[in-house]
């Protein structure tokens, strides 16, 4: 009799455990429906989240333009976040190298992080060479076409080389740096960017002005 009682007690406890698991699952997953919406966050910030994806050769002026835009947005009381090689390669992508597979994973992670910022209502700028259409399309698919604006910093190769204080282009031409974009690795120029900026002829202030206009922000 004791063994039968123990058996049925075990069954009852197991049933109770399974029911509690079901309740926990029902309580866990719907939490996303109760979180603040993107619209709530954008309303709080008084701005709309958007992705500005800067692409171009090394030395084209991606980071320089991005920083100038960030300062202008900050001056206007708008929240902006820049993602570039310095803060990404030293952090969440520190374990990645420069193989084709790692380059793709690098862009994928950047896009996923960018999407989180955009969904929070933050004006997000990614400044990466991202040399192929495939990589930029990967980022656009993750972030969403509506929020993704491709900005081509189209400064010519000769000017990028002239600006290169680190001598990376010279090393690449001597064969000391392998797979260097623009020299020993190709760069696929965007065919239909939202905006194209050649910093060799367009002053920095004018670049910022054009970006503000693209964002629908009054000069």
PLM regions with names:
Residues 62:
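Conserved lysine of the Walker
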Residues 154-210, 217-218:
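Small-molecule kinase domains that catalyze NTP-dependent phosphoryl transfer to phosphate-bearing small molecules
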Residues 67-112:
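Conserved substrate/cofactor phosphate-moiety recognition/catalytic segment
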Residues 17, 21-51:
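Extreme N-terminal, non-catalytic leader segments
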Residues 91-98, 114-172, 179:
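ATP-dependent NMP and nucleoside kinases share a basic, alpha-helical "lid"
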């Amino acid at each position: 009799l004791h063994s039968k009682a123990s058996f049925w007690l075990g069954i009852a406890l197991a049933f109770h455990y399974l029911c509690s698991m079901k309740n926990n699952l029902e309580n866990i997953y719907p939490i996303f429906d109760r979180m603040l919406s993107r619209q709530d966050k954008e309303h709080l910030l008084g701005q709309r989240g958007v992705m500005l994806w800067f692409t171009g050769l090394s030395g084209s002026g991606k980071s320089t333009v991005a920083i100038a835009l960030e300062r202008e947005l900050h001056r206007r009381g708008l929240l902006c976040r820049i993602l570039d090689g310095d803060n990404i390669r030293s952090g969440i992508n520190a374990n990645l190298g420069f193989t084709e597979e790692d380059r793709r994973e690098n862009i994928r992670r950047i896009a996923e992080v960018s999407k989180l910022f955009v969904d929070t209502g933050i004006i997000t700028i990614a400044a990466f060479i991202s040399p192929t259409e495939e990589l930029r399309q990967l980022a656009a698919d993750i972030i969403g076409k509506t929020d993704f604006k491709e900005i081509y910093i189209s400064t010519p190769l000769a000017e990028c080389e002239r600006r290169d204080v680190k001598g990376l282009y010279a090393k690449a031409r001597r064969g000391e740096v392998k797979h260097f974009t623009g020299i020993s690795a190709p760069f696929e120029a965007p065919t239909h960017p939202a905006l194209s900026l050649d910093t060799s002829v367009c002053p920095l202030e004018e670049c910022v002005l054009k970006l503000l206009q693209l964002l629908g922000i009054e000069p």
